[in-house]
Amino acid sequence: MKLSPGKNAPDVVNVLVEIPQGSNIKYEYDDEEGVIKVDRVLYTSMNYPFNYGFIPGTLEEDGDPLDVLVITNYQLYPGSVIEVRPIGILYMKDEEGEDAKIVAVPKDKTDPSFSNIKDINDLPQATKNKIVHFFEHYKELEPGKYVKISGWGSATEAKNRIQLAIKRVSGGQ
């Protein structure tokens, strides 16, 4: 069974959760073996502020699926799939190049708590600060690794990025 980006992409997309909110372990999905593997324990004394995964059936220029941070008030199990609404994008680079993160919330039917959040600017500033702080610092103690944040993008920018990443898989770009 091959998981798709979602029937209503880019407005609502599937996210395969790799890392639960609160974890200090970086898990990664191994496509060849179809399992989630431990990549590493974070070197810093930090935990992922929200659930983290990727949109299946997408491809970024670096060859990886498009990363997503799913804003919830609870942990999601690694390997679970949740339908989300993209609300923005965090532009950043790391030691390997561009590594933007889509920011999303559960679709309204899954969790109506986030129905008022339509765009990144609808998130509380404290939540955005927490996200930026995490990504600016989570690799600090790892030799040769770094992250540089360049800013936020809107829900429209996030959806455009998703469409482009889907086209890369389907041969459109």
Swiss-Prot record:
**Cited Gene3D superfamilies:** Inorganic pyrophosphatase
Can you say where in the cell this protein is located?
Cytoplasm
What cofactor is this protein dependent on? Mg(2+)
What does the record give as EC number?
A: 3.6.1.1
The record lists substrate as bound by 26, 40, 52, 138
What do the Gene Ontology cellular component annotations say? cytoplasm
Q: Which positions in this protein are listed as binding Mg(2+) 2?
A: 67
Q: Single Gene Ontology BP term? A: phosphate-containing compound metabolic process
Report if keyword Oxidoreductase is assigned.
no
Q: Which UniProt keywords apply?
A: Cytoplasm, Hydrolase, Magnesium, Metal-binding
Catalytic reaction list:
diphosphate + H2O = 2 phosphate + H(+)
Task: Offer an example of a GO molecular function term for this protein.
Answer: magnesium ion binding
- Pfam families found in the cross-reference section: Pyrophosphatase
Q: Cite the SUPFAM superfamilies for this sequence.
A: Inorganic pyrophosphatase
Write out the residues that bind Mg(2+) 1. 62, 67, 99
Hey, which family's this protein in? Answer: Belongs to the PPase family.
Q: What does this protein do?
A: Catalyzes the hydrolysis of inorganic pyrophosphate (PPi) forming two phosphate ions.
Summarize the subunit comment: Homohexamer.
User: What's the protein here called?
Assistant: Inorganic pyrophosphatase
Give the species this sequence originates from. Answer: Sulfolobus acidocaldarius (strain ATCC 33909 / DSM 639 / JCM 8929 / NBRC 15157 / NCIMB 11770)
